[in-house]
Amino acid sequence: VDHGQSPDFLGRNFMSTVETAGTLAVRAALLLGVSTTVALAAPAYAQTAAAEDAGDEQIIIVTASKQAKTLQDTPISVSVTSKALIENAQIRDAFDLQSVVPSLRVSQLQSSANTNFIIRGFGNGANNVGIEPSVGVFIDGVYRSRSAAQIGDLPSVERIEVLRGPQSTLFGKNASAGIISVVTSEPKFELGGQAELSYGNYNALIARAEITGPISETIAFSLAGNYNRRDGYVYNEALNINENERNRGGVRAQLLFKPSEDFKLRLIADYDKIDEICCSVVNLVDGPTGNAVRALGGRIISNQPLALRSATNFPSTNLVDNFGFSAQADYNAGQFDLTFIGAYRGVRLSTNADSDFTSADLIGENSARNAIDTYTAEFRVASKFDGPVNFLVGAFYFHENIDASGALTFGRDFRNYASALSGGAYTSLEPTLRALLPGTPAGQFGGRGQGRFEDYDYKNRAISVFGSVDWNIVEDLTLTLGGNYTHDSKTYATNVVTTDVFSGLDLVRAGV
């Protein structure tokens, strides 16, 4: 079964990109590498990140322990994907990341918004809006609480850290399987940028551009945008359309305020959108129920799992809007580093899937519409003593509101389909039920448009304090102790309505 996971070669052709510091360069390459390049001189202010020095290129700095340390000094099982590898492997989003990170698997389910991240075989949460995923995803230190907020194309990425195994001490309740931490590039005090335009098979078109530079001696900016589209590679014979397409894009703006070497404030705002027909499936086995589908005029692609063909009576649509802003302040107070991160994230999604996966109208609607608003704040203090003992302490606040609604209804052919599978028992049951509920019109049991309609209102508040102590006992041997306390409160209200004509029948009172 294929749930929208595209072959690795889709849209991977004819790409070129250039990035400069101190110059602005643009290169576009299409059709076997025909390209043009434009460069112009650019002024540069004095501030330059130490990480850009040539002498530091072989040192890998990670923040897996919420402190900047070398990979060798980080006592956590972590895989680091560098900027160079991301560009060379053409990693566009978190789905592509599994191709270069061992033990990470990304499973796209019945919609783009339902994507499971699995580390070492553990992961959950994509299909239940009331459950947070057990693999936490952080982008620039901001927690993305739902998979719909995690799947947009990755922005200008500096590195990606994948922490394997439980990380609850520093990251709280939603990190029992691991962490994916995406670190993007800060604005630079030198004018520069990059642009990329690529074209591949299935009419894949990817466009990305970024510009960064100084506004003044203390303020720098960056603006970035991306667009990613590709024709679907699964042909729907019933609808004469291609499914499992890509159609997504986004914009991102940053400001970096750095009045001194001891303080900096980084502001980020972003918006991305997904509007795709996804996720088609192909049949592995034409089972005994296939004859019932064909009797209703439906079509099944028999036993051709590699043909990339399907047949449904309406396309499965996915519309996701993901947006937010964050602020991070860092202050060097001598022997202590102080960090504050505050953020708001919003997600609006609407999906509808033909979940019977046939061209017969069995399922009329299987839809979900969610509005998710998430507020987070984190403050931490890390020591920098010269002695053998150092510590990190912090506090985290989480507040989330979710308004969710959905519908699962019968299609036009469901009644006859159920009757065919049950040898007529399904429709013959209706007279008995009508006798128990006088006045019920005939022919409505399992009728078109009937089903279940649900609305949920979730609220989640959590406060946690955490900390760790590192004791350098002897050279090359450090003992780390950590702890976390979390108070988590969830409330919800629900309204579920079943419109089937016999849903109000009390079979117990009726003596059945």
Regions found by a protein language model. Name each.
Residues 2-89, 95-101, 212, 261-262, ...:
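N-terminal Sec signal peptide and the immediately downstream disordered periplasmic leader
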Residues 115, 132-134, 146, 155-158, ...:
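Outer-membrane beta-barrel translocator/receptor signature
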Residues 181, 188-190, 198, 210-305, ...:
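Periplasmic-side early beta-strands and strand-to-turn transitions of outer-membrane beta-barrels
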Residues 86, 98, 160, 180-182, ...:
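Hydrophobic packing within well-folded, soluble alpha/beta domains
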Residues 237-242, 392, 399-512:
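Signature of Gram-negative outer-membrane beta-barrel scaffolds
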